[in-house]
Amino acid sequence: MSMVYINIFLAFTLSFMGLLIYRSHLMSSLLCLEGMMLSLFVLMTVTILSNHFTLASMAPIILLVFAACEAALGLSLLVMVSNTYGTDYVQNLNLLQC
């Protein structure tokens, strides 16, 4: 396993650990999700380029499209929650708390 793959795996792991640790605020959770998507994009791109997979060359672009959609939905949810409650706590998203 080369150092590039180890660094990408470490970036994904740190983003995932940040998602688990800083899950009280929605903005920090969204940033950790974006870090995870970025490391997956770099991992897919490096793997495709190093193994010369020409048929799978669109996969990183498709992942970026899904990451952009996820970011847009997350930011719209963040704006809605912050306008409604005044904070960006994830606990405000509980539907059982009418």
UniProtKB/Swiss-Prot annotation:
* Protein's name in the database: NADH-ubiquinone oxidoreductase chain 4L
- Membrane topology according to the record: Multi-pass membrane protein
Function comment = Core subunit of the mitochondrial membrane respiratory chain NADH dehydrogenase (Complex I) which catalyzes electron transfer from NADH through the respiratory chain, using ubiquinone as an electron acceptor. Part of the enzyme membrane arm which is embedded in the lipid bilayer and involved in proton translocation.
Molecular function (Gene Ontology), one example: NADH dehydrogenase (ubiquinone) activity
> What reaction(s) does this enzyme catalyze?
a ubiquinone + NADH + 5 H(+)(in) = a ubiquinol + NAD(+) + 4 H(+)(out)
Chief location bin: mitochondrion
Q: Which family does it belong to?
A: Belongs to the complex I subunit 4L family.
Give GO cellular component annotations, separated by semicolons: mitochondrial inner membrane; respiratory chain complex I
Q: Which PANTHER family match?
A: NADH-UBIQUINONE OXIDOREDUCTASE CHAIN 4L, NADH-UBIQUINONE OXIDOREDUCTASE SUBUNIT ND4L
Q: Name one Pfam family in it.
A: Oxidored_q2
Species per Swiss-Prot/TrEMBL record: Taxidea taxus (American badger)
Localization annotation: Mitochondrion inner membrane
User: What biological-process terms (Gene Ontology) are attached?
Assistant: ATP synthesis coupled electron transport
Q: Where are the transmembrane segments?
A: 1-21, 29-49, 61-81
Q: Cite the source lineage.
A: Eukaryota, Metazoa, Chordata, Craniata, Vertebrata
Subunit structure comment from the entry: Core subunit of respiratory chain NADH dehydrogenase (Complex I) which is composed of 45 different subunits.
E.C. no: 7.1.1.2
**Which key words are in the record?**
Electron transport, Membrane, Mitochondrion, Mitochondrion inner membrane, NAD, Respiratory chain, Translocase, Transmembrane, Transmembrane helix, Transport, Ubiquinone
